[in-house]
């Protein structure tokens, strides 16, 4: 709990009336004007008992200094006393009568009556504050009420219809229709659109026709592939016809190989189109075809394969200068044979 003590103004009046402090006196007791000795501690002839007893008494009164225990500190006493005097609202300094320099420096103060006391700084009457707060609070409330129904400039007649508003929800737009229960038939129905529809952006994709020439420097345009014929056949014609079945069946033929007869279907198969390639090629490009060639020497299916050692693979021909030598040798042998034949004919004759 804080120590109860006398306030500064009555305590100061008591110190002045005691006449125990030299230099502290009334200049005009009726107007409550008094002076306080204010000599600087650095001045020659300054004395604690003569120039600082008032400041020491205030430090003792406030509990900042205890005689015999604390070390004397006149500068701190004077600073605390000056701060306390400046904080009082009912005491002001008479600066035109004060002398702050010299050995006889002093300050003159005046105690103000209740009628002249100014109001505390930073505080305003409660009435003004309350009016401001009410004014600020009412503005947003009124604005929200005006905009809640969608239209702010409606006549008082429409205010009655606030309870009769019915909401109809469409598939795309929410529309509020005001009823006609309390108005005459002359007033037309009003529709207030609360949620307008969103604006959609339409994007068109165009493709170039096949007839237009396309340069190699340009990028390929967006092309839509035609429907696959294979897919159409799967969806439309699920059951093949007799002709298609006949075309798809292999034709077996009898063949002889090394005195053995066997059936072979080689060479009878027709060419087929890849069913799924129709979706990847356009009309101006040839379709990709797959053909099956007939083997030159087919083998029967029931015969065994010859050993790999008997198979002689032709050696790869490398273009070297020595490749022309066999041709020269064969030519020389032919010439030699012809010469031998001619000689034999000559001898026989």
Curated annotation (Swiss-Prot):
There is a cross-link at residues 137, 260 (Glycyl lysine isopeptide (Lys-Gly) (interchain with G-Cter in SUMO2)). Residues 228-254, 301-349 are annotated as: Disordered. Residues 228-239, 340-349 have a biased composition (Polar residues). GO terms for biological process: immune system process. Acetylated by CBP/ p300 during cell-growth. Acetylation on Lys-75 is required for stimulation of H4 promoter activity. The major sites of sumoylation are Lys-137 and Lys-293. Sumoylation with SUMO1 increases its transcriptional repressor activity on IRF1 and diminishes its ability to activate ISRE and H4 promoter. It is found in: Nucleus. The keyword Ubl conjugation applies. It comes from the Eukaryota. The modification Phosphoserine is found at residue 225. Keywords: Acetylation, Activator, DNA-binding, Isopeptide bond, Nucleus, Phosphoprotein, Repressor, Transcription, Transcription regulation, Ubl conjugation. Residues 5-113 bind DNA. GO terms for cellular component: nucleus. GO terms for molecular function: DNA-binding transcription factor activity, RNA polymerase II-specific; RNA polymerase II cis-regulatory region sequence-specific DNA binding. Specifically binds to the upstream regulatory region of type I IFN and IFN-inducible MHC class I genes (the interferon consensus sequence (ICS)) and represses those genes. Also acts as an activator for several genes including H4 and IL7. Constitutively binds to the ISRE promoter to activate IL7. Involved in cell cycle regulation through binding the site II (HiNF-M) promoter region of H4 and activating transcription during cell growth. Antagonizes IRF1 transcriptional activation. Interacts with BRD7, IRF2BP1 and IRF2BP2. Interacts with CREBBP in growing cells; the interaction acetylates IRF2 and regulates IRF2-dependent H4 promoter activity. This is Interferon regulatory factor 2. It comes from Sigmodon hispidus.
